[in-house]
């Protein structure tokens, strides 16, 4: 699946100066294609988008005109169109090339000037504000090499539960790595950041966030600063407590790494000086304090605006007086405006500012400055979108592929994971596949300083993975399930009750039907759902509905949508339209108009299209959900479609319904819709059909 765009690129001119050479299968358009990962019985037919007349293109409703406000947001809408005429204007072509570039990419080796600058700063006094033996950083990364090797042999075993707790509305579960317990040091639970966090970070954090931590923030900070893997679902888009915590954590990690290297440099320098004077005693120190390459932190984010906010937070907490390339960074990553106020609040927050998803930038910190657009091999922190990194990691030209800069990542942050799912989760898998691989080249690394567990290809066992999302999904949860951090992993699972679920907040007494089908495992549920729908649900729809028109079929998965549409075209005589994220604006406008006026009786509608456009569909009288939406807000918005028809007098609450097809493997999504108590009944009861109002 991809957000469609033109496959054409300007041809290279004779002198090669005016445009780029054409690259086969490269660019945002190719990389946004979601490859099929599971077998399908029905192949997806290739559809040709019908050409639309000018009058059809001008049929857009007033809502569409408001929708186009804001330059950055309009750029997002442009990506969703399938018809992109090629521009002949050279200036515009050059501009488009700049936009197609992965903003911030710099794969050159680190500059000599930067090395000289750091050598000057090495003379500065290194902060010594933490007890090494009581510091989670020192204990975690200073673990014995033999202990790491022993853990590596046991990672396929079961990870036992080490601790369970209930903090507010969250169930917190910590799993320990299998085998003998290694040396560990946990960060304290406190109302603010303190030791062992570096003083400069703690002071800057306190200045920006003076309020004491809530119990949830204390628990979250405890696990993050103890170097455990963390999976945290924030429940709502505006709950951003985790962002300030991981920003402080990655800065603390970078500064401690730098200070450790500088301290050991002094130790070696003093030894060699004593050796020259004939005063050296004992063997030469052999500190192991480095990886193959410099980058230690990778932060994955969905949009440039999200990256802008995180980088600004990092700069603010770093206390850097000098900020190199700050103006260029703001020009490429920041933008004003966004979606209109008529859109939901979470949607406006998601696509506010620059919503371009194509970027990758390096940040290099010294004691007095921060350099934006640093070389990837000289940066401390990499901030990127998965699609931006995939462009580099899997360049079609084998010789241009680069992944060495990910070899020594020690902290991985995946933020706004649900948005990344909607873009293309395959790119997250691509990044995870390349991270902590032994590099092809060694880029001037000092092997005498590289940690043995890195040389032994065990870096993944020490890497901390932090995943943050609005709601838990199987894809997001699997990142932590398959992580191998020997410090353990902690999950923060929000508990949804009947009082806090979406169903309880609708305010519309509408018939809500849930119908279960059987599936022995998640893999077989795809085919089982399709068979159940086409054999049991689809044939009975005309008998169950009280209206001849206004039936909306909502399909969460694009592959299921293509399969279902192909079946309905070839095996039924249903009068229906189908719109998805590939459809042109004219086609969407036409389909919506025909559906709202009753000329089309049935409309197929994908979850990803709703995510990116959040339409207010008119004429909806009944809804069938091919599967429960992962985002519970979508369920509420779908109900509102029917409520709109009821308000206009086109439908009646006693006759209209919303039916959800589900199996026991949809339990997490059901819990967010109807609460944990009802979800347990829906999945485990003998009955297969339930009705609520």
UniProtKB/Swiss-Prot annotation:
Q: Does the keyword Ribonucleoprotein belong to this entry? A: yes
Gene designation:
UTP25
Source organism per entry reads Clavispora lusitaniae (strain ATCC 42720)
Subunit: Component of the ribosomal small subunit (SSU) processome composed of at least 40 protein subunits and snoRNA U3.
Major localization class = nucleus
State a single Gene Ontology molecular function.
rRNA binding
Name the residue ranges with Basic residues bias: 1-11
Task: Tell me where in or outside the cell this protein is found.
Answer: Nucleus, Nucleolus
| Name assigned to this protein | U3 small nucleolar RNA-associated protein 25
A GO biological process this protein is involved in?
maturation of SSU-rRNA from tricistronic rRNA transcript (SSU-rRNA, 5.8S rRNA, LSU-rRNA)
What family classification does the UniProt entry report for this protein? Belongs to the UTP25 family.
Q: Which UniProt keywords apply?
A: Nucleus, Ribonucleoprotein, Ribosome biogenesis, rRNA processing
Q: Where is the composition biased (Basic and acidic residues)?
A: 12-21, 62-71, 83-99
The answer, when asked if ATP-binding is one of the entry's keywords, is no
- Which residue windows does the record flag with biased composition (Polar residues)? 27-36
Q: Give the compositionally biased regions (Acidic residues).
A: 44-61, 107-130
The protein's matches in PANTHER family, at most eight in alphabetical order, are given as:
ORF PROTEIN-RELATED, U3 SMALL NUCLEOLAR RNA-ASSOCIATED PROTEIN 25 HOMOLOG
Its biological purpose is as follows: DEAD-box RNA helicase-like protein required for pre-18S rRNA processing, specifically at sites A0, A1, and A2.
Show the segment(s) annotated as Disordered.
1-138, 273-292
Q: Which GO terms describe its cellular component?
A: nucleolus; small-subunit processome
């Amino acid at each position: 699946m991809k957000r469609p765009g033109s496959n054409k690129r300007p041809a290279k001119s004779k002198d090669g100066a005016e445009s780029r050479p054409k690259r086969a299968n490269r660019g945002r358009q190719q990389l946004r294609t979601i490859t099929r990962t599971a077998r399908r019985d029905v192949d997806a037919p290739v559809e040709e988008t019908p050409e639309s007349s000018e009058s059809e293109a001008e049929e857009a409703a007033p809502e569409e005109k408001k929708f186009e406000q804001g330059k950055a947001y309009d750029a997002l809408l442009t990506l969703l169109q399938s018809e992109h005429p090629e521009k002949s204007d050279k200036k515009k072509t050059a501009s488009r090339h700049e936009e197609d570039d992965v903003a911030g990419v710099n794969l050159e080796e680190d500059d000599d000037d930067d090395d000289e600058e750091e050598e000057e700063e090495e003379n500065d006094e290194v902060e010594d504000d933490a007890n090494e033996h009581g510091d989670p950083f020192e204990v975690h990364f200073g673990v014995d090499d033999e202990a790491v090797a022993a853990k590596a042999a046991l990672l396929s075993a079961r990870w036992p539960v080490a601790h369970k707790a209930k903090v507010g509305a969250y169930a917190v579960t910590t799993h320990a790595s299998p085998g003998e317990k290694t040396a560990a040091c946990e960060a304290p639970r406190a109302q603010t950041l303190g030791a062992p966090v570096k003083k400069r970070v703690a002071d800057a954090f306190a200045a920006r966030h003076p309020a004491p931590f809530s119990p949830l923030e204390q628990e979250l900070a405890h696990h993050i600063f103890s170097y455990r893997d963390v999976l945290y679902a924030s429940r709502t888009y505006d709950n951003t407590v985790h962002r300030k915590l991981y920003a402080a954590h990655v800065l603390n990690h970078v500064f401690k790494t730098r200070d450790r290297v500088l301290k050991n440099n002094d130790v070696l320098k003093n030894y060699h000086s004593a050796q020259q004077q004939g005063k050296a005693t004992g063997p030469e120190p052999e500190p192991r304090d480095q990886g193959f390459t410099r980058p230690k932190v990778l932060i994955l984010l969905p949009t440039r605006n999200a990256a802008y906010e995180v980088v600004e937070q990092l700069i603010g907490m770093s206390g850097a007086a000098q900020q190199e390339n700050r103006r260029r960074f703001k020009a490429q990553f920041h933008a004003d405006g966004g979606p209109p106020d008529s859109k939901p609040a979470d949607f406006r927050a998601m696509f506010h500012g620059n919503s371009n998803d194509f970027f990758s930038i390096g940040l290099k910190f010294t004691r007095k400055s921060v350099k934006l657009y640093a070389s990837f091999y000289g940066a401390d922190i990499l901030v990127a979108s998965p699609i931006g990194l995939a462009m580099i990691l899997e360049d079609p030209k084998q010789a241009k592929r680069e992944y060495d800069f990910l070899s020594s990542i020690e902290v991985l942050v995946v933020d706004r994971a649900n948005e990344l799912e909607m873009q293309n989760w395959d790119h997250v898998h691509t990044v995870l596949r390349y991270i902590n691989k032994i590099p092809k080249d060694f880029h001037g690394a000092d092997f005498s300083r590289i940690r043995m567990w890195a040389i032994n290809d065990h870096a993944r066992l020490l890497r901390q993975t932090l995943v943050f999302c609005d709601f838990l999904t199987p894809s997001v949860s699997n990142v932590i399930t398959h992580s191998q951090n020997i410090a353990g992993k902690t999950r923060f699972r929000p508990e949804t009750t009947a009082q806090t679920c979406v169903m309880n907040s609708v305010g519309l007494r509408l018939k809500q039907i849930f119908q279960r089908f059987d599936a022995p495992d998640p893999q077989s549920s795809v085919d089982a759902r399709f068979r159940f729908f086409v054999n049991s649900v689809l044939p009975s729809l005309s008998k169950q509905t009280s209206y001849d028109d206004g039936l909306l079929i909502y399909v969460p998965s694009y592959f299921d949508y293509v399969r279902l549409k192909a079946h309905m075209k070839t095996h039924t005589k249903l009068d229906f339209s189908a719109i998805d994220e590939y459809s042109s604006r004219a086609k969407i406008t036409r389909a919506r108009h025909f559906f709202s006026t009753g000329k089309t009786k049935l409309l197929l509608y994908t979850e990803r299209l709703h995510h990116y456009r959040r339409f207010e569909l008119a004429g909806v009288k009944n809804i069938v959900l091919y599967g429960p939406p992962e985002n519970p807000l979508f369920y509420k918005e779908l109900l509102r479609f029917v409520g709109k028809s009821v308000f206009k007098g086109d439908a009646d609450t006693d006759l209209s319904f919303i039916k959800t097809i589900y199996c026991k493997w949809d339990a997490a999504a059901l819990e967010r819709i109807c609460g944990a108590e009802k979800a347990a009944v829906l999945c485990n009861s003998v009955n297969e059909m339930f009705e609520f109002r």
